[in-house]
């Protein structure tokens, strides 16, 4: 009889323990893929292995291949676009007017757009034209290559008048500061303001993408989705904003979801910056350490029940929600090259910049930094933690 009772309770205990065992193994598998990292008090998670064909899908991997374009057909397309005509060779319409883009999205309400693109990147390229350096036909060649290799993306061109309209309508508090900026500085501010307002991909015309980026964008979205689905606790609210950039954060290439908190921190940092306006548009950030420093500079803390939390905190139904740091992804520098190249005395970066219209794109590409195999590293921390009040 005793043996029967022991067997009975053993079976009951085993049934009770099975769900816990499964949960333990699930979390063990999760953290085997996503290893925790702490930098300056900020908790990140890094994906330690790349996505497989089964996870990404053959379609996304196929899109990442370099597209070869016939030089003569490219020249014909360049001529059409420079004359604001449709490029029938590749079926490319002239760039969308930023005024029309702004008007349409303002009418639809950007808060709704932000919700629609939750955990996703809007498939739109934005570029700012009309800077005071010479507009080169080579930049149009870069545009043709970009658009042919990304057929499902929209392409929006912003002028300084468009940026002025954006500030007047959406950023009244920055109007006075904006009016005092140089054209170069307006490019930089407009870059960040537009990135925050609309999300998508913002890039300099002088930057040449060497690879299709659908794979990187999709991998980021998939990683966020997988991580969120594995966190079953009711203490985590499901919103993981995505920010993507080269390993050295540049104002020449950034990707983000709309209303991204890290982009807002960059804007705040610029507003407080004492850098001379003439060099304001040439101030790159270098890697994750600089990003972490920005977090530290742009946040204040509060104390709840002897625990310190940051200023992005709100109370709902007697519960305290604390907003932590956003999702940051660094993409391989080999995915793009630029036409710029700082002089040795200037601040340099992993990307290739040139402060002159005289450059050799092939030389730039061939001398761009080589990847070390760790660039496709995905970092994040949970966006919201719930604390019972």
Swiss-Prot record:
Keyword Transit peptide recorded: no
InterPro entries: Glycosyltransferase_domain (IPR051706)
Intervals, Lumenal compartment: 38-389
Compartment annotation: Endoplasmic reticulum membrane; Golgi apparatus membrane
Key words, A-Z: Cell wall biogenesis/degradation, Endoplasmic reticulum, Golgi apparatus, Meiosis, Membrane, Signal-anchor, Transmembrane, Transmembrane helix
Biological process annotations from GO: 4,6-pyruvylated galactose residue biosynthetic process; cell wall organization; fungal-type cell wall biogenesis; mannosyl-inositol phosphorylceramide biosynthetic process; meiotic cell cycle
One term of GO molecular function: mannosyltransferase activity
Chief location category: endoplasmic reticulum
Transmembrane segment boundaries: 17-37
Superkingdom to which the source organism belongs: Eukaryota
Topology of the protein relative to the lipid bilayer: Single-pass type II membrane protein
One term under GO cellular component: cell tip
Function per UniProt: Involved in cell wall biogenesis. Has a role in the addition of Gal-beta1,3 moeities to galactomannans and their subsequent pyruvylation. Has a role in meiosis.
Stated name of the protein: Pyruvylated Gal-beta-1,3-epitope synthesis protein 2
Protein's organism: Schizosaccharomyces pombe (strain 972 / ATCC 24843)
